[in-house]
Amino acid sequence: GPLEFYIRYVARLASQNPLTHLLWKLEKGALIYVRATAAGVFTINDTVGAHDPRLRVMVAAGTGVAPFVSMIRSEVCRNPLADLSKWVVLHGASYPAELGYRQELLALSTTNGLKYWGTVSRPDETREWIGDVGRVESFFEPDRLPDLEQRLGLESGDFTPDSAVVFVCGLTGTIAAALVRLLDRGFIPNARVIREALGVPPDVRPSLFYELYDPTPVIDVGDPSLIESLRARLQTALARR
């Protein structure tokens, strides 16, 4: 299929792996090498499997929406009439213009049942915006989760690993905030080092997967007080299920 880059130039490096900046310096017609087979396991098949019946909640910050667009396009490419009612995209950016693929995703919400909500963190600078406001991880704040559950057709308190699996792509702050807030609902991260720090048995299946832009740790597992607090929150959530 076609190769498509979704990049954004920024004045200050936000990652120690600045691929965007390297691409930005290339002139038109420059050659780059791309392997025939994509690497990585941030896919539906390599996480929960194509037949998992739960909601697939995809949380993206900025250009982090790119892998989710690829997943959704693949589904529609295989079947233009694919039912996307179990697919959910939560996309955050500073300004509406930075919500890439918004029109395409909104169109799929009409034709295929995709659930899509964009949110902007600087609404005061964009008066025409009438959608959700705040960072994308704010959808998981305790006072906002009931609204998200209602939009998803769930009863209050039912947004748990029994009903949904969560995928997050973005910078460390977004992933960390989403992960920590969803511990209170019993979501288990896929990262082995975090699972071990939280005392999650190896046979417990993960329900939150993430793709990180940079090598900054999502959770400081070397902070005893933090880990003790997070472990207690997770155990409380699991005890309620």
Where do the protein language model's features map onto the residues?
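FAD-binding FR-type
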Residues: G1-V57, S121-R122, V204-I219, L234
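C-terminal region/appendage detector
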Residues: H21, I32, V76-R78, L84, ...
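Short, flexible hinge/linker loops that cap or flank conserved catalytic cores
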Residues: G49-D52, L81, D158-T160, P202
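Structural motif
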Residues: L55-V57, V88, V165
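Active-site-adjacent beta-strand anchor residues
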Residues: M58-A61, V168-C169
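Ser/Thr-glycine-rich phosphate-binding loops at phosphate-binding pockets of nucleotides
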Residues: A61-P67
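Histidine-anchored nucleotide/phosphate-binding helix
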Residues: P67-P80
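Reductase modules of NAD(P)H-dependent flavoproteins
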Residues: L90, Y95-R241
